[in-house]
Design a protein with these regions (language model features):
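Positively charged n-region of N-terminal signal peptides that target proteins for export
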Residues: 1-5
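Bacterial N-terminal signal peptides
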Residues: 7-15
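A beta-rich soluble binding module of mature secreted/lumenal proteins
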Residues: 19-175
Length: 175
């Protein structure tokens, strides 16, 4: 019974995440989807409820034959030694011209808005945002980024309307 209740709450939260409001948030002009695939370390985020207390968070993408994006989101809960949590949503690229707008599906039929709003030319850093500006993920190909880069991304997020007081740096163990 507890599982059904938790699943229902999670599905409701995801369905609410699918709703968008607020002024448009612009995406990058174009994403080379093959280059975007692979592992991304979550450097900081305005977390969803499942990500609170995440350590060593990594989002991995793989382009499936059907054009969807197989996603694995994993992290340690509560500490570096905490239990490893793994989620496997599927991404649906909804803007085929830019590849910068996706619907991320944790449970059918709900898809959460997923917009690539920042991407460095070398594909080493990215920011995923939402029109509601309720969640955001700063990600990189490495577990840490230079402080100047992080500050530049924070300036960008403030410019596009995010409340930086909600942002949480994700502890990452350097390998």
């Amino acid at each position: 019974m507890r599982f059904i209740t938790l699943t229902s709450v999670f599905m409701l939260a995801i369905s609410l995440m699918a709703c968008t409001s607020g002024p448009p948030i612009h995406t990058v002009d174009s994403v080379n989807i093959e280059r975007f695939m692979g592992d991304w370390y979550v450097i900081a985020s305005i977390p969803t409820f499942i990500e609170k207390d995440a350590y060593n968070a990594i989002e991995s993408y793989r382009l499936a034959e059907d054009g969807t994006v197989e996603t694995t989101f994993s992290f340690n809960k509560g500490s570096f030694e905490g239990p490893r949590k793994v989620y496997r949503p599927r991404g649906f690229i909804t803007d085929k011209q830019s590849n910068a707008v996706w619907g991320m599906q944790f449970f059918w039929p709900f898809k959460a808005e997923y917009r690539i709003i920042y991407l460095t030319e070398d594909y080493s850093q990215t920011v995923i945002g939402r029109t509601k500006r309720d969640y955001v993920w700063i990600m990189a190909r490495t577990p840490v980024i230079p402080e100047d880069d992080y500050d530049r991304i924070l300036d960008f997020l403030k410019e596009v309307g995010y409340d930086l007081s909600k942002l949480r740096k994700i502890p990452q163990q350097e390998k």
